[in-house]
Amino acid sequence: MKVILLKDVPKIGKKGEIKEVSDGYARNYLIPRGLAREYTKGLEKAIEHEKEMERRKKEREKEESERILKELKKRTHVIKAKAGEAGKIFGAVTAATLAEEISKLTGLSLDKKWFKLDKPIKEIGKYSVEVILPGGVRDTIEIRVEREE
């Protein structure tokens, strides 16, 4: 029996693929669990349309990510933090802090998950921070942590 997979199925195939499986396997396992549907031309066209829409969505997401990254790379971002005389910050600058402060500076809506820090920043200085945006867009931006007056 020919089926169209609705989800990835180990050892069978990926979502949207058309596969030939035994009738019993399809009727007793794949179809009841919502993993596949019986193949029809109409269903195939619907799945192809869905794949095309998903591809376009990813393309738009990547373009938006590239635009955001271009905006972020325009300048060195200055983050103000309370610090002692030795340059040690009270607390730390984390990815969440970066997202919040850079959002205020640029007007962009940023997610803390996009900023990759090996460990929180605990001293005043200049740092390179890796930014990983949706769509696989990644680069580094410069930030400078300064003492808050």
Curated annotation (Swiss-Prot):
Record GO terms (molecular function): rRNA binding; structural constituent of ribosome
Protein's name according to its UniProt entry: Large ribosomal subunit protein bL9
Keywords, sorted A to Z: Ribonucleoprotein, Ribosomal protein, RNA-binding, rRNA-binding
Gene that encodes the chain: rplI
InterPro entries reported for this sequence: Ribosomal_bL9 (IPR000244), Ribosomal_bL9/RNase_H1_N (IPR009027), Ribosomal_bL9_bac/chp (IPR020594), Ribosomal_bL9_C (IPR020069), Ribosomal_bL9_C_sf (IPR036791), Ribosomal_bL9_N (IPR020070), Ribosomal_bL9_N_sf (IPR036935)
Lineage summary: Bacteria, Thermotogati, Thermotogota, Thermotogae, Thermotogales
An example Gene Ontology biological process: translation
Superkingdom per UniProt: Bacteria
Organism, as annotated: Thermotoga neapolitana (strain ATCC 49049 / DSM 4359 / NBRC 107923 / NS-E)
HAMAP family xref list: Ribosomal_bL9
SUPFAM superfamilies: L9 N-domain-like (SSF55658), Ribosomal protein L9 C-domain (SSF55653)
Family recorded in the similarity comment: Belongs to the bacterial ribosomal protein bL9 family.
